[in-house]
Amino acid sequence: QFGLDPSPADTNSGHGTHIAVSVLGNGSGDAAATGVAPEANLVMYALEHDPTGTFGRIGSIYDMLRDAEQMTARISVNAWGLNGNYGQYTADARSVDTFVHDKKDLTPIFSVGDRGSFGASQVSSPATGKNVIAVGASTTGVPGTPSAGAVVNFSSLGPSLDGRIKPDVVAPGVGLCSGLAEEAQSPAGASCLSGNHAGGNAYYMTLSGTSQATAIASGVAGLTREFIREQVGIAAPSSALVKAAMINGARDLGTADIPNAAEGWGEVDLERTVLPMDGTTVLDTFVDDKKSLSPGFGLLYSFSIDASHGLDMTLAWTLSLIHI
């Protein structure tokens, strides 16, 4: 409907299947390749034209997000970005921001791109959007790759050209072993784990990129949203709340003080996001997302804090249309 290729098959690189399995694969082929959120449901759009490998979209990204939202999707996984206009706030970025303003409980997540060698402000649009979560890639320590705990050198750097922090977070994106489409004719990576489809392709292949990092971050976003719904009791968590929770739980990789133009606010960490104190205790949660502020005004809150613990506060908001 929105892609260049009407076929549901992934006959070119297998990129889309690799992303989908990383997010929500059920591990039926090999438990080691279970996705981050294996009980999630999938709404998919074929944006890669398999006969040519060309990427493209038909219609507006606003309409695509609206279609997904109407089919109950609440996390939008976008392991792609536009060529050119790097670092710029484009019409597509504005379109995504407008949709999030209109439908505040869908969280769009975009890869920043793999242009780390080109210097600063190389983030692809729509990751330059203001109401999105823009994801860069971190190392994993997979054998033959750099040690875990750093931003990988191919991950595009921020900030946006108008000075905003990008990426927002990073996630593991090096040497990820995930699903390979049975019909893929030009697999983009080497096979991993064991087992083969009837047609000869391996079940799994290894890929690296901010696309792969976006899949991991999107799975974390889905589980974070589920936690807020089921454990905190907020039936329809806003995109801003999911973003705030993930940023608050992100781990500083230590390359520079956060936030910075390489890792944003740090590497996503599900445990620190939902159980930040000791990994076992569900905290009392206070959320106030109903008030708005005008220039020159403020809101005052008072909390009683255990002196033996610190206080972390993260503010995230969905920009109004006049600021988009």
Residue ranges, per PLM feature:
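A short beta-strand element within beta-rich, extracytoplasmic domains
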Residues: G310-S320
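C-terminal subdomain of the subtilisin-like protease fold in secreted/lumenal serine endopeptidases
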Residues: M44, A171, A202-Y204, E226-A307
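Conserved small/polar residues in nucleotide/adenosyl-binding loops
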Residues: I322-I324
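Subtilisin-like serine protease catalytic core
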Residues: Q1-R57, M71-S76, N83-Q88, D102-T107, ...
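Short pre-catalytic strand/loop immediately N-terminal to key active-site residues, enriched for Gly-Thr
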Residues: D5-T11, A190, A198-T210
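Flexible glycine/proline-enriched surface loops and loop-helix/loop-strand junctions
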Residues: L4, S147, V151, G199-T206, ...
